[in-house]
Amino acid sequence: MQLLKDRIRKDGIVKQGNVLKVDSFLNHQMDIELINEIGKEFKRLFEKEKITKILTIEASGIGIACIVAQYFNVPVVFAKKAQSINIEGEVFATKIESFTHKKTYDVIVSKKFLKPSDRVLIIDDFLANGCALVGLIDLVISSGASVEGIGIVIEKGFQSGGEIIREMGIHLESLAIVDSMNAEDGTVVFRGDK
């Protein structure tokens, strides 16, 4: 998605340790006009999948998932990273290791909100090593629902997550795939760049 790549080049900040900061427009302060375009693009990419539910994980994916869900006219469910007194009844649970925060989370979704009849589109802001997505896929499978696709805003193509998910045979669409980044000069090279 050229609009997204241009914005990453303009406002993204490359840090040491393969960190790409996009908090000025995507996952802290959110540019709703850009995210609307992201929502339209995911609708175009997954419109044949008959999606009934959007699933993401707290916190960065929630805003993006909500905009995407408007184009599909379906609810959003977000996996919580901790058991809460607000969640009543039984839950689907898995463990997810976070690349960003370097810790393992117990992640849960109430059984009330994922049913075997659901056709789920998973949405997230980043794909790095794939641990979060594998955990979300596990939650969907545990519910008996089907993963119809995964929409990622930014994939770090130099890490293994995309390959892991594609080898599972799941329809994965990443709007920008970063093949390399240089913290010294701030450059980002996207897949398909010449």
Swiss-Prot record:
It is found in: Cytoplasm. Its EC number is 2.4.2.22. CDD domains: PRTases_typeI (cd06223). It comes from the Bacteria. One of its GO terms (molecular function) is xanthine phosphoribosyltransferase activity. Pathway: Purine metabolism; XMP biosynthesis via salvage pathway; XMP from xanthine: step 1/1. GO terms for cellular component: cytoplasm. InterPro entries: PRibTrfase_dom, PRTase-like, Pur/Pyrimidine_PRTase, Xanthine_PRibTrfase. Keywords: Cytoplasm, Glycosyltransferase, Purine salvage, Transferase. Pfam families: Pribosyltran. Xanthine binds at residues 20, 27, 156. 5-phospho-alpha-D-ribose 1-diphosphate binds at residues 128-132. One of its GO terms (biological process) is XMP salvage. It catalyses: XMP + diphosphate = xanthine + 5-phospho-alpha-D-ribose 1-diphosphate. Homodimer. Converts the preformed base xanthine, a product of nucleic acid breakdown, to xanthosine 5'-monophosphate (XMP), so it can be reused for RNA or DNA synthesis. Belongs to the purine/pyrimidine phosphoribosyltransferase family. Xpt subfamily. This is Xanthine phosphoribosyltransferase. It comes from Lachnoclostridium phytofermentans (strain ATCC 700394 / DSM 18823 / ISDg) (Clostridium phytofermentans). The gene is xpt.
